[in-house]
Amino acid sequence: MAAPKGNRFWEARSSHGRNPKFESPEALWAACCEYFEWVEANPLWEMKAFSYQGEVTQEPIAKMRAMTITGLTLFLDVTLETWRQYRVREDLSEVVTRAEQIIYDQKFSGAADDLLNANIIARDLGLKEQSQFEDVTPDKGDRDKRRSRIKELFNRGTGRDS
């Protein structure tokens, strides 16, 4: 059944849109801390085979779970776009920055200690080894003069001309 024409039921609502997920920086920080604690309490498990006196057994080994922004947003039940908007909100930007720094540090430290795959983490963190090559050869005119002089000296040393 359609609403009657000219109705204004929507004006009866006290606010428009859904209520914010986190109404204060403290609420967002508490939720972020819950995620950090969850990551620590829920490691990934790998089955490793061990051999002792000819008997092979498999044992579960706890492995560090990397914190991620995507994991955090899923835990908080917000989208990545919402997280980006929190980053620019004056009241929440400090919490977002701090959470991102904690995630960065956990990944970097885990990779440095070989608890996480260093190649994957380096790519994720935007780290790369830089090799910079610079052509320090002077302009072509000087290079031609130098080559000519080297050739002249070489030929003089070997007793040949041209």
UniProtKB/Swiss-Prot annotation:
Family assignment from sequence similarity: Belongs to the P22likevirus small terminase family.
InterPro entries named among the record's database cross-references: GP3_package
Task: Provide the gene name from the record.
Answer: 3
The UniProt entry, under Pfam families, shows: GP3_package (PF16677)
- Which Gene3D superfamilies does the entry link to? 1.10.132.80
Q: Has UniProt tagged this entry with the keyword Ribonucleoprotein? A: no
Specify the protein name: Terminase, small subunit
Q: Which UniProt keywords apply?
A: DNA-binding, Late protein, Viral genome packaging, Viral release from host cell
The UniProt regions of compositional bias labelled Basic and acidic residues, in chain numbering, are: 137-162
**What the protein does?**
The terminase small subunit binds to the packaging initiation site and regulates the ATPase activity of the terminase large subunit. The terminase lies at a unique vertex of the procapsid and is composed of two subunits, a small terminase subunit involved in viral DNA recognition (packaging 'pac' sequence), and a large terminase subunit possessing endonucleolytic and ATPase activities. Both terminase subunits heterooligomerize and are docked on the portal protein to form the packaging machine.
Helix-turn-helix (HTH): annotated segments: 7-27
Subunit-level organization: Homononamer; forms a ring-like structure through which genomic DNA is translocated into the capsid. Heterodimer with the terminase small subunit gp3; the active complex is probably heterooligomeric. Interacts with the terminase small subunit; the active complex is composed of dimer of terminase large subunits and a nonamer ring of terminase small subunits.
Q: What GO MF annotations does this protein's record show?
A: DNA binding
Q: Where is this region: Disordered?
A: 132-162
